[in-house]
């Protein structure tokens, strides 16, 4: 290294940082595997890739089956809810019909209640008038 440094001008030598030989890695020459090894590795790779893809497809298929089952259950639940809604609607129509049938009687009850209130007011007025008459009668009787 010292011999190589002598051929380089002094300013050039100062610019280069000192090298740490412990940090330098050595590379080995890449050797191609034998043809039989490549064929075996390819077969192994394709086998594992087939296994992987089969697993992925199986998982996807299972997901679709799960979604199908969930859709069927949801459909059944909505059919049940539809039946419940139909029953509620039918019962509500029956109640409305019964209320319509009772409406004349309810109107009569309201009219009777108004008449009773008017009669009660008349009774109070009559009572007040009779007390006035009684007071006048007693007053006239004393004379």
UniProtKB/Swiss-Prot annotation:
The modification N-acetylalanine is found at residue 2. GO terms for cellular component: axon cytoplasm; BLOC-1 complex; BORC complex; centrosome; cytoplasmic side of lysosomal membrane; cytosol; gamma-tubulin complex; mitochondrion. It holds the Pfam family BLOC1_2. GO terms for biological process: anterograde axonal transport; anterograde synaptic vesicle transport; extrinsic apoptotic signaling pathway via death domain receptors; lysosome localization; melanosome organization; mitochondrial outer membrane permeabilization; neuron projection development; organelle transport along microtubule. Component of the biogenesis of lysosome-related organelles complex 1 (BLOC-1) composed of BLOC1S1, BLOC1S2, BLOC1S3, BLOC1S4, BLOC1S5, BLOC1S6, DTNBP1/BLOC1S7 and SNAPIN/BLOC1S8. Octamer composed of one copy each BLOC1S1, BLOC1S2, BLOC1S3, BLOC1S4, BLOC1S5, BLOC1S6, DTNBP1/BLOC1S7 and SNAPIN/BLOC1S8. Interacts directly with BLOC1S1, BLOC1S3, BLOC1S4, BLOC1S5 and SNAPIN. The BLOC-1 complex associates with the AP-3 protein complex and membrane protein cargos. Component of the BLOC-one-related complex (BORC) which is composed of BLOC1S1, BLOC1S2, BORCS5, BORCS6, BORCS7, BORCS8, KXD1 and SNAPIN. Residues 1-36 are annotated as: Disordered. It comes from Mus musculus (Mouse). PANTHER family: BIOGENESIS OF LYSOSOME-RELATED ORGANELLES COMPLEX 1 SUBUNIT 2 (PTHR46479:SF1). GO terms for molecular function: gamma-tubulin binding. Residues 80-128 form a coiled coil. Keywords: Acetylation, Coiled coil, Cytoplasm, Cytoskeleton, Lysosome, Membrane. Component of the BLOC-1 complex, a complex that is required for normal biogenesis of lysosome-related organelles (LRO), such as platelet dense granules and melanosomes. In concert with the AP-3 complex, the BLOC-1 complex is required to target membrane protein cargos into vesicles assembled at cell bodies for delivery into neurites and nerve terminals. The BLOC-1 complex, in association with SNARE proteins, is also proposed to be involved in neurite extension. As part of the BORC complex may play a role in lysosomes movement and localization at the cell periphery. Belongs to the BLOC1S2 family. This is Biogenesis of lysosome-related organelles complex 1 subunit 2. Residues 11-36 have a biased composition (Basic and acidic residues). It comes from the Eukaryota. It is found in: Cytoplasm, Cytoskeleton, Microtubule organizing center, Centrosome; Lysosome membrane.
């Amino acid at each position: 290294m010292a011999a190589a440094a002598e051929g380089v001008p002094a300013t050039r030598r100062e610019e280069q940082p000192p090298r740490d030989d412990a940090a330098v890695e050595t590379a080995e020459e890449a050797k191609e595997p034998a043809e039989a090894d490549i064929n075996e590795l390819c077969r192994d790779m394709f086998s594992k890739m087939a296994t992987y893809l089969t697993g992925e497809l199986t998982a996807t298929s299972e997901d679709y089956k799960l979604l199908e089952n969930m859709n069927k259950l949801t459909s059944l639940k909505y059919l049940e809810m539809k039946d419940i809604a139909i029953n509620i609607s039918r019962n509500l129509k029956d109640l409305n019909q019964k209320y319509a049938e009772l409406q004349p009687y309810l109107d009569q009850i309201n009219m009777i209640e108004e008449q009773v209130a008017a009669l009660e007011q008349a009774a109070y007025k009559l009572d007040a008038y009779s007390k006035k008459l009684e007071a006048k009668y007693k007053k006239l009787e004393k004379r």
